[in-house]
Amino acid sequence: VPSAMTLATFLCLAALACAGEKVLLDFGEGFDFGKVPTTDARVCEAKREGGSALHVETGHRAEWPGITLKAPKGKWDLSPFEFLALDAKNVGANKVTLCCRVDNPGADGVRNCVTGRLTLKPGESGTLKVELRRKPRSAARNKLFGMRGYPGEPGGDEGAIDAAGVTQLLIFVPRPKEAHAFEVAAIRVGGAYTPPPPKPDEERAFFPFIDTFGQYIHRDWPGKTHSVEELKARLAAEAKELEERPGPPDWDKWGGWAAGPTLKATGFFRVEKLDGKWWLVDPDGHLFWSHGTDCVRENDTTPIEGRETWWQDFPGERPEFAEFFSKGHALHGHYAGRTVRSYGFGQANAKRKYGDDWRARIADLAHRRLRSWGMNTIANWSDPAVYLMRRTPYVATIHFQSRPLEGSQGYWGKFRDVFDPEFNKKLRERLAQEAGKSAGDPWCIGYFVDNEIAWGDEVSLAIAALASPPDQAAKNAFIADLKAKYGAIEKLNAAWGTSHASWDALLASRAAPDKKRAWDDLAAFYTRFAEEYFRLIRDAVKEVAPNQLYLGCRFAWVNDRAARAAAKFCDVVSYNLYRRSVADFRYPGPDKPLIIGEFHFGALDRGMFHTGLVPVKDQAERAAAYKAYVQGALRHPQFVGTHWFKYSDEPTTGRVLDEENYQIGLVDCCDTPYPETIAALREVGHTMYRYRLDAW
């Protein structure tokens, strides 16, 4: 029931704010509160003096509890307006962050939508405003595709919409830990949008826009490569620098702290807690903190199909660079679902810079660079030809395919069915390939198995099992659990509010039960599913490589139930944490060592079109952000390492897999290090052991 507070002032503010604006949706007479779609929420009318508001109470079982407000006639045309706004009041007992997302068809939280947010203390009112950021549509832009970001337009199509085709609004609380209550007054739009003037000669002047090195033509910046001679000069300068600065003098051969405490040496990497802080311990018994970078390998390739006018002096037209054509499968974006022809500008640049033996030379250089830069780990998705040189400790990457859980969904694909015998079989077949390579290798810290898989909320995988076909192994396992608990289908029906005629009827059904009524059973099976996942992998890893660590699955989107399951079986639990700081990160499970598998920062001052997931203003701010992030992890008692994503920038025109074209490398597409970032790496890496030991 809504609180008894008076809304008069609240609604008066809304009315004043509406001056010169248009009400898009109000909650007065005729609004059907009972037909508002909800996710872990309930709604009702808050009828007070001065008008009505929408009262919303949210739970904390879903990742994004809230409501959906659909356009009454299928879509709203908001093209005349600059923003959407709503007035909200926190009527709950807890501080709340409210989000309002404006959607086009196909909105996924990143593309085809724009989002605004507002944080309110208990009793506080405020206005949540969402800028109706348009998808860029200049004459040249209409000819561009297949990238996350576009020239001169930070973020490109991400966080942008077609304002003429808005289909719905989502009002939600992101990943709450407690229940919330809030009220929303009339939703309105305002501001007169003025489209940019057309530039009739723009297209002719714009193309081609990528030079022979894969760089943006229409801009210059510090460090841009203008000739092969510049590449050679930078190579010579870097060789001198690496000779003068070979690496921290107090490290042992592994990158552990030779000058620090000596613990038990086992000949392999392990974990130990010392004076309240978790550490890795290197094979010689020295403290080791994993400071590394992902993707130490050849650069990603970029699609070239349909882009013939984009390139100036395209290297692929020369016989000596024709070897860098390839084909790749696209998972997301313009080329999604297709195998497309692509080209490796980075490889062509490496051949120009290092000669015909470029692969061997860049592999050798990677080890020398990392040591000099204060890094001691070759991290995920790196080239075995590089890390099996056994000069820098590394982690190995394990991926495999088995039958999916058909009712599941996720950004990178469906979850696999851990109860299907094929899961364990394919896992062990893949790990067997590491025999004689990483398995038993003292330089191998351990294994990441999988990456950013879709854990959903605390019951999602149980619901996915029920939504799967009758021959799904997980579904049969779940129903067996229910039979053991309830015995008769009638007892299950009474508990869940269902009307299945028999257990076979439940097996045949693909309908999801009422979440609230079935919660305890759904949560119990989710726990069983998650623990089975981690147990099977732990057992397989330890059978093939008993001396290597199981480093988990690199959580990106995870609930507490899955995180606690990981703690039971992983030696180290891994997270990909894209944020400014991890100093205050709180793990929901028991005291376990943690490792960061991915993080990055990017800017638009070096010719790239997208900042990546955590934007910064420029390279100076990028360096400062790097230092602050890693030192925050060093102060945290549970973190035993941070791995930057990634070694090289992504292609200017987007990688094949998913169109990413982020400025997130330690080196650019011409293999030129970013000096500001490298200086930050050195500052942090060369002092990290004393810094961590002395922290609190």
Q: Which residues does each PLM region occupy?
A:
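Short carbohydrate-recognition loop motifs
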Residues: C44-G66
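Extracellular ligand-binding interfaces
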Residues: G59-A160, G165, E178-E183
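Glycoside hydrolase catalytic-domain groove-lining segments
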Residues: A524, R528-G612, K627-L634
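Polysaccharide-binding and catalytic clefts of secreted carbohydrate-active enzymes
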Residues: P283, T293, T301, R307-W358, ...
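Active-site clefts of carbohydrate-active enzymes
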Residues: S342-A350, E406-R416, A508-A523, A556, ...
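Aromatic-rich peripheral "rim/lid" segments of glycoside hydrolase catalytic domains that contact
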Residues: A464-A477, F645-W696
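Active-site-adjacent substrate/metal-binding segments within catalytic domains
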Residues: F213-L388, L405-G440, K515, D520-R528
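Substrate-binding cleft of secreted/luminal carbohydrate-active enzymes
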Residues: P442-G446, D450-E452, F599, V614-L666, ...
